[in-house]
């Protein structure tokens, strides 16, 4: 990051964000392992038959049926991810498929032309990046995970601000890492996750910060 971001305060330009591949994929992997929503809820607007998937049989949902999707379980399924409990940001650069999951397209990084992973690569998404320097309007085509990765939902009802949120997080992380070194302030085993309206830590996560500009903590 030091070699890429020129601003002494760590605020990257759009072109610098494009070069911060590992930083962007670290954020994406964090969203895979610790997604904000515990579940997604969808309602069938008409009778629909879902493919067999890994269950070995098709499932028909009647019109009006509510469908609950467990995002945490989906993102950590060994059927959909290689070593799902391992933090591995570069997994998004490797293809992965499972022929036993009928109807699943797998992870296809060769379709990656955007900045962040998402559920599919079939559409263009418009976002506005607002920074102290510019307002940038761009169209990004994302790469396909075929709905194995849905931290912001998917389809027509997915979060409208997902790209802005990820760009904002990249800028924030850049600023923090430019200024501080971080160290976990407790035993990792003490950090417990619980579910409410979001998935979050039970009692926070103590972190020690050391200024990179001085010896003060």
Where do the protein language model's features map onto the residues?
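Conserved cytochrome P450 K-helix/beta-meander segment immediately N-terminal to the heme-binding cysteine loop
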Residues: 34, 69-118, 134-141
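Short FAD-binding loop at a beta-strand-to-alpha-helix junction that anchors the flavin cofactor
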Residues: 126-128, 149-152
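Active-site proximal loops enriched in glycine and acidic residues that flank catalytic Cys/His/Asp
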Residues: 42-43, 71-73, 91, 153-154, ...
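Cytochrome P450 heme-binding "Cys pocket" and the immediately downstream C-terminal segment
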Residues: 136-138, 144-145, 154-156, 162-200
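C-terminal helix/juxtamembrane-tail motif
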Residues: 200-217
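Hydrophobic, repeat-rich solenoid/adaptor surfaces of innate immune receptors and signaling proteins
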Residues: 65, 71, 169, 173, ...
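Cytochrome P450 I-helix active-site segment
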Residues: 1-37, 44-46, 55-65, 82-94, ...
């Amino acid at each position: 990051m030091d070699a890429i971001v020129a601003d002494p305060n760590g605020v990257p330009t759009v072109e610098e964000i494009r070069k911060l591949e590992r930083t962007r994929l670290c954020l994406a992997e964090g969203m895979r392992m610790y997604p904000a929503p515990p579940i997604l809820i969808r309602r069938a607007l008409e009778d629909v038959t879902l493919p067999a998937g890994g269950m070995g049989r098709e499932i028909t949902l009647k019109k009006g049926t509510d469908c609950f999707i467990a995002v945490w379980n989906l993102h950590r399924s060994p059927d959909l991810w290689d070593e799902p409990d391992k933090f591995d940001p570069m997994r998004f650069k490797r293809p992965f498929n499972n022929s036993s999951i009928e109807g699943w397209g797998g992870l296809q990084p060769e379709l990656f032309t955007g900045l962040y992973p998402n559920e599919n690569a079939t559409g263009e998404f418009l976002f506005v990046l607002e920074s102290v320097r510019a307002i940038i309007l761009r169209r990004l085509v994302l790469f396909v995970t075929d709905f194995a990765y849905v931290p912001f939902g998917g389809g027509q009802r997915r979060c409208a601000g997902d790209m802005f949120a990820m760009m904002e997080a990249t800028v924030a992380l850049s600023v923090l890492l430019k200024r501080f070194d971080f160290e976990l302030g407790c035993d990792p085993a003490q950090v417990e996750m619980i579910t409410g309206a979001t998935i979050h830590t039970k009692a926070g996560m103590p972190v020690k910060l050391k200024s990179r500009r001085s010896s003060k903590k």
